[in-house]
């Protein structure tokens, strides 16, 4: 029997088709939420600054606000003498000390507003307090030691563009602008359905011939890691067409899309494709991806159903290469950039012509640079091939591999792996 992935499409084609289907079947809606609940959500609109940041000129140091023109010619041997008329600190109104006039100074703390007339700040280190006066030992230029209004962001400037995934710093910016709420796209609802008569939930008694369901937990965690996806995870369903169909149809009533785990081939016990055959239609069946070539996409009741392998590494590759970028494109965004390093190949990394390969790799270092070699090329069912690997290398379809001595980009599974022996 010929397997359906003998006519696979490229990863790029799969992503393009998936994005098209997602856009046709899922309506993006905007919601307003408090900024302190918006971490990793996707901005649904361009946000303009309503005010300058900082909102007023303020001191960048502790010292004295002055008119820079009054310090012309100041040196250690020929200091300029200025009268200290007042002091200001953070939170004081800018008019507290009135207008700064000729040969006057105002003592200021870091962050304090500059009084009208002042255009620079003399640091304590460049002055000496003598009674009600200071001696200034250095000539300073206009706006020295001053945070100018609008230096950070100007009123009317775009602070956050549509499709931005909000980070802790974006939330800080929104708070600095006085915005209590932010408009974001509503979370996506994703159904996860693991299939397999051999699967039992973690915590249950493990009988001979059974194994704990784990790939569904990996995919659920990958979805939750995105931050803007609500996961509906079902318990494992046996390899019976009617049971899989029932679980899938009922689950899709509350979800925007589904991801099935396992049953992605056409063996006698791989029933997911039969459910798509009977209840929906295929968008693509199989992708030129290693591991993960059985990754597929169908439609049931106009809702996308992604099919991933039950093997954890193949499921991870299918999710990373196809599902993740497709969902981000739906949200007019792009996935966060993963940490990476450049390393020199110490053992040839091979590829199958026409396939995009996600090769798990191990790193080593001589103290000057990093070296990389394949780690467990085969074994997409082995979690150790990811747990014990330092990262992975993506080999494009048109590249047959990387030879010893070539430099490649290694995507790191975690930055703690940067320090290797």
What are these regions (language model features)?
Residues 2-6, 65-235, 249-250, 376, ...:
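Short, glycine/charged-enriched hinge/interface segments at domain edges or termini
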Residues 7-74, 166:
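Intrinsically disordered, low-complexity, positively charged segments
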Residues 8, 12-15, 26, 31, ...:
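Flexible glycine/proline-rich
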Residues 9-13, 30-33, 61, 115, ...:
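Conserved active-site and cofactor/substrate-binding residues in soluble primary-metabolism enzymes
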Residues 2-12, 180-308, 312-322:
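Helix-rich terminal scaffold detector
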Residues 18-26, 46, 114, 157-164, ...:
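Structural signal for hydrophobic packing residues in well-ordered secondary-structure cores
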